[in-house]
């Protein structure tokens, strides 16, 4: 089993007065672009870590049996606190997991599947996406 931790707890401080995750991008909430890609991918479970405005974000999320919602009440402590909350849901059944940000609307299920396959082949390495020689997210472990 490979799980994905989708980080969705931040305060969106760079966009004042709005939560960017619920803001519309190409006709749907920003978070639902990456979520749709995760749902369509081979990933077995999607652990969504909510925090800031968790009720508003939860209301607009796509639905799937793959999704597990958790709430980071300490989201103001930063991204590492959300990663820790997500990691608590990774079990021994997992051969690997990936961490992705929820504000990445251009990530497709094919990108996620590349990390998924790579994790199954060599799960003792860190797996990253690369574009034009730049390393980025999502990251697999």
Tell where the protein language model's regions lie, with residue ranges:
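Conserved beta-strand scaffold positions in the cores of enzyme catalytic domains, especially
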Residues: 22, 69, 126-128
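Conserved beta-loop-beta/alpha segment of the NTase-like Rossmann-fold superfamily
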Residues: 76-137, 141
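Short, well-formed alpha-helical segments that are part of the catalytic scaffolds
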Residues: 20-21, 27-39
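N-terminal nucleotide-binding beta1-loop-alpha1 segment
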Residues: 1-16
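Hydrophobic packing residues within well-ordered alpha-helices of enzyme cores
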Residues: 15, 57-61, 115
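A short, conserved beta-strand element in the Rossmann-like catalytic core
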Residues: 12, 56, 105-106
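Structural beta-sheet core signal
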Residues: 4-6, 47-48, 98-99
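Conserved N-terminal catalytic core of the sugar/cofactor nucleotidyltransferase
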Residues: 33-96, 109
């Amino acid at each position: 089993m490979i799980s994905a931790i989708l980080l969705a707890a931040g305060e969106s401080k760079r966009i004042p007065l709005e939560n960017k995750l619920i803001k519309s991008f190409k006709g749907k909430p920003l978070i639902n672009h990456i979520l749709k890609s995760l749902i369509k991918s081979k990933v077995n479970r999607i652990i969504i870590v909510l925090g800031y405005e968790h009720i508003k974000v939860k209301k607009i999320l796509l639905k799937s049996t793959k999704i597990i919602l958790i709430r980071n009440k300490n989201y103001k402590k930063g991204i590492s606190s959300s990663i820790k909350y997500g990691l608590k849901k990774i079990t021994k059944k997992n051969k690997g997991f990936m961490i992705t940000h929820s504000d990445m609307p251009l990530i497709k299920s094919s990108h996620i599947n590349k990390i998924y396959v790579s994790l199954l082949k060599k799960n003792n390495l860190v797996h990253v996406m690369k574009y034009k020689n730049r390393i980025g997210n999502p990251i697999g472990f």
